[in-house]
Amino acid sequence: MSEIENNKEPQLILPKQQAAFDRITAIGRIVLSLDRKQFPLSVRTNILITGESGAGKSFLVRAAALDLGLPILSLKTSEWMLLGSAGRGATPTWPRIHEFLMRCANLPGGVILIDELDKICDRTSWTTYLRSEAFSLLDLTVPPNLVDRDGDTIFEDSIEAAQRVLRSKILVVGAGAFQSIWDDRQRPEVGFLSAERRIASPDMGDLFRILPREILARFGSNLIVLPPLVEGDYFQMLDVFADRMPDFWKPRFIKLGRERIPAAARLKLGPRFYEELVLEMVLVERQEIANFHKDDWNQSGPANAVIDSDQEYEF
């Protein structure tokens, strides 16, 4: 789990993602500005984003939070720590959510992303408890009897304050691959068209047939489907990110990216591929420097090298 601070760097939204981005930000602005007390019914603002692994679900939510000017708390169900686990050296997730909500009390609002929702749909005893805690968040309900990171009781008035924040100024977004939705759609077909162009996104009827009923109960029809990223999308993102690179790094970034994009697209690495690419680019550059110094030393040879004892050399 990590809390992501906003920065001023604009995020890349592909044309195929624009409609999804616009809907997330539109609902986010409603969350921030709407007086819900005027309505006799609850306003359902939870959003569920589905798309195959590497489609850029969490990337899109972070971009929306940045556009809205809001902090985002990212949660993964695979890293969720249950209430009562503090005694085993772990910090439960819900007290951290409470901290985030109390921070947002003094801000226009916030975004909470619950990623990997598809991983809590089986029926093990562990996921039963995990599902209960995650669904409390989706139901906009802060559990009672919380303790903080130090094990001290969180007072009831603080829990009630967090509850008001959660229900009035927090956009809750769920995300999950629900990979079975996509597996049958990527089987090779006979024909001349590229397989990239034949991957069809599921429609609303498909989602209602496949998604667990208890998931649908928390989101209704407020579902967003992200189309898969194909190789051309990766090259488009490379060009945009390269334009933002310092001049020294830009050609290196492009060269390494073009070499590795086919594998990245095949492995469905998604937008995080470019973060890894930056590290690999720097590693390659550092290795080139190390090899240069080594070759320079080997060519001159230790017998021919003149070393000033007052000067430091790095090899």
Name each region found by the language model.
Residues 67-71, 106-107, 192-267:
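Conserved C-terminal "switch" segment of AAA+ ATPases
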Residues 44-75:
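Walker A/P-loop
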Residues 53-55, 67, 78-82, 117-120, ...:
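Conserved nucleotide-binding/hydrolysis micro-motifs of P-loop NTPases
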Residues 60, 231-315:
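C-terminal alpha-helical "lid" subdomain
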Residues 72-107:
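Short glycine-rich substrate-engagement loop in P-loop NTPases that contacts/grips substrate
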Residues 3-46:
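Pre-Walker A (pre-P-loop) alpha-helix and adjacent loop at the N terminus of AAA/AAA+ ATPase modules
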Residues 59, 118-124, 130-228:
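Canonical AAA+ ATPase core
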